[in-house]
From Swiss-Prot:
The name this protein goes by in its record: UDP-N-acetylmuramoylalanine--D-glutamate ligase
Top-rank taxon: Bacteria
Signal peptide: none
Pfam families noted in UniProt: Mur_ligase_M (PF08245)
Main function: Cell wall formation. Catalyzes the addition of glutamate to the nucleotide precursor UDP-N-acetylmuramoyl-L-alanine (UMA).
InterPro entries: Mur-like_cat_sf (IPR036565), Mur_ligase_C_dom_sf (IPR036615), Mur_ligase_cen (IPR013221), MurD (IPR005762)
Family classification: Belongs to the MurCDEF family.
PANTHER family: UDP-N-ACETYLMURAMOYLALANINE--D-GLUTAMATE LIGASE
Biological processes per GO annotation: cell division; cell wall organization; peptidoglycan biosynthetic process; regulation of cell shape
Species of the source: Campylobacter jejuni subsp. doylei (strain ATCC BAA-1458 / RM4099 / 269.97)
Catalytic activity: UDP-N-acetyl-alpha-D-muramoyl-L-alanine + D-glutamate + ATP = UDP-N-acetyl-alpha-D-muramoyl-L-alanyl-D-glutamate + ADP + phosphate + H(+)
Length: 402
């Protein structure tokens, strides 16, 4: 069997590394390969122009591989990483949505590791590295993965609210939603889907539990939010993790949940040498994540760093939302001019900074002790950084130098 891998990313490299002994050398296609070579394991590294669909039995793309790429158009046996491992996948929980996927997945893992659960997917560990004999797979599941998945399904699908994101990849918000909901048509009567109420009528055989907001979801699962130490925007993530635990074990481990430690880059608070508050929310790459961050600090004047790769999303609603805050904006990245135009239309004060270092310096000239400086850019980072995490590290280094 000849297996072709599209894209030289973490997912495909993990498959090639861990399964080369079972399936023999893989053919790995990537636009960066200009000539045919072999890696240390004997896998062929090929340019996409060398792909012959008649010589390939299965094609597996990296999750974010563009759907309009010529390889996707030519592939006859396309399947996702989830489909490829579905035959050995134990009981699984898939967690998706626009914001909060990672936190909810990590919280659920924190609550369920004692039963032998393992965590993977978009959260960092490819499926090729997960133990097929584990009791449970908890998978953070991106819209990219769902787009390419046509066979696999979970026993529990936990969907957090959906808002516009990755529209340049999916083509439209409608298509983005459709990919998020696509798994429901494969679920059966024994499965459970926790969905925002707006998606309740999506065709599925699964048992649907719908919710309007944090309070409603907590009520549906008899969860006492007073016993949860996390506040918005992480409260919904915590409630969802407890709901998953309740479905699987009929328990609610509040004390264990409250011991969970948040990861970096999400509303990570830092004090500078003058005791002023800076917040690293570099992972906020869409408008709903920024709105959640703004709401958290609504009682303070906010100095917001915004901009980067906007991924083709119209952010007009976000700037209209900002009108209700005491806020000043600092535009960075490839979308600097676009951010300044949004601000002008919304009658918001904005500074043209272009780079993060200049934004931090400019904010430092204005920031008072009772105010907050917030990096919550509403945009991806790859126009100027290798990742959102690097953007966060640069932000923190700039603060140290003040």
């Amino acid at each position: 069997m000849k297996i072709s891998l599209f894209g030289y990313g973490k997912t495909t490299c993990s498959i090639a590394e861990n399964l080369v002994d079972k399936f023999g050398p893989f053919d790995i296609y990537d636009d960066h390969f200009t000539e045919t070579k072999k890696d240390t394991l004997g896998n062929l590294l090929l340019n996409p122009n060398d792909f012959d669909d008649n010589l390939s039995n299965i094609e597996i793309p990296s999750p974010g591989f563009p759907p309009n790429h010529k390889l996707i158009q030519e592939a006859k046996n396309l399947q996702s990483e989830y489909d490829f491992f579905y035959d050995v996948m134990p009981k699984s929980v898939w967690i998706s949505g626009t914001n909060g996927k990672t936190t909810t997945t990590q919280m659920a893992m924190h609550l369920l590791s004692h039963i032998g659960a393992v965590m993977g997917g978009n959260v960092g560990t490819p499926l090729a590295e997960l133990d097929p004999y584990a009791k449970l797979w908890i998978l953070e599941t991106s819209s990219f993965t769902l787009h390419y998945t046509h066979k696999a399904k979970p026993e529990i699908y936990a969907l957090l609210p959906i808002s516009p994101d990755h529209l340049s990849w999916h083509g439209s918000f409608k298509d983005y939603i459709q990919d998020k909901l696509s798994v429901l048509k494969r679920m059966n009567e024994c499965d459970v889907a926790i969905l925002p109420k707006i998606h309740t009528n999506t065709p599925t055989k699964a048992h649907i539990i719908s919710y309007e907001d944090e309070k409603d979801l907590a009520t549906k699962f008899s969860i006492d939010t007073e016993k949860i130490s996390f506040k918005s925007p992480f409260l919904l993530d915590a409630i969802m993790a407890l709901a998953i635990e309740k479905i699987l074990l009929d328990t609610l481990s509040y004390k264990l949940l409250n011991n969970f430690v948040m990861e970096k880059n999400k509303l990570e608070e830092i004090k500078d040498s003058q005791n002023r508050l800076w917040v690293n929310d570099t992972k906020a790459t869409n408008e709903s994540a920024v709105m959640a961050a703004l709401n958290r600090y609504k009682d303070k004047k906010i100095h917001l760093i915004i901009g980067g790769d906007d991924k083709g999303v119209d952010l007009s609603n976000l700037f209209d939302f900002m009108k209700g805050f005491d806020i000043e904006l600092y535009a960075i990245g490839i979308s600097t001019e676009k951010m300044l135009n949004y601000a002008k239309k919304a009658n918001l004060k904005a500074y043209k900074c272009e780079i993060l270092q200049r934004a931090v310096s400019e904010i430092s000239n204005h920031l008072k002790v009772n105010e907050v400086a917030l990096l919550s850019p509403a945009c991806a980072s790859l126009d100027q950084f290798s990742s959102y995490a690097q953007r966060g590290e640069v932000f923190k280094e700039c603060i140290k130098k003040l």
